[in-house]
A protein has these predicted regions:
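C-terminal accessory segments enriched in acidic
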Residues: 1-170
């Protein structure tokens, strides 16, 4: 699925600051694939895109390309979460929750750990996720707090589905 992102200047964006200083840049940005948390598949696409780009620059074939088709790409309007849970009752209201993780280096520096946090609560029927859970029978033990580390257990008819403790998925 391809979506066109907003191209306004973002002061926190690495490449935008190089462009601001007058350096030409090529932006290659992508999400990931389901069941590919290490992003090995997407790296293949990055590599192929860089090869095609270098070839296009070397042969000047980019001069013959019609760039108007670029703006035919639909605008990205979907929120994609790592985990999306539908069918919860939160504070007496039926809702969905969207959960994302950030990766941090482990203490030994040899790997990373994922810390999950609640990124959205409400009607998320328009959203997608790498993992989606949906049931009318979910029970929740713990609290759902927006923008805080996930810290709850999710069960479906006494079967444990997910368990988070201080942001870590157990």
């Amino acid at each position: 699925c391809i979506g066109l992102f907003n191209d306004e200047y973002e002061p926190r964006a690495f490449g935008d600051n190089f462009q601001k200083l007058g350096t030409s840049t090529i932006l290659i940005e992508a999400g990931g694939f389901k069941a590919d948390p290490e992003k090995q598949e997407i790296r293949k696409f990055y590599f192929a895109a860089m090869l095609r780009g270098i070839n296009s620059i070397a042969t000047k074939s980019y001069l013959q390309k019609n760039t108007s088709h670029y703006f035919d790409i639909p605008k990205n309007n979907k929120q994609i979460f790592h985990i999306l849970i539908h069918g919860l009752v939160v504070d007496g209201i039926k809702a969905s929750i969207g959960i994302n993780y950030d990766e941090y280096p482990t203490h030994d520096g040899m790997g990373t750990e994922k810390i999950y946090s609640i990124q959205d609560i409400g009607d998320l029927s328009f959203c997608d996720a790498y993992q989606t859970f949906s049931s009318e029978n979910f029970s929740l033990n713990g609290e759902i707090i927006f923008n805080q580390n996930a810290n709850f257990e999710l069960s479906d008819k006494h079967k444990m589905i997910l368990c988070f403790q201080n942001g870590q998925l157990l």
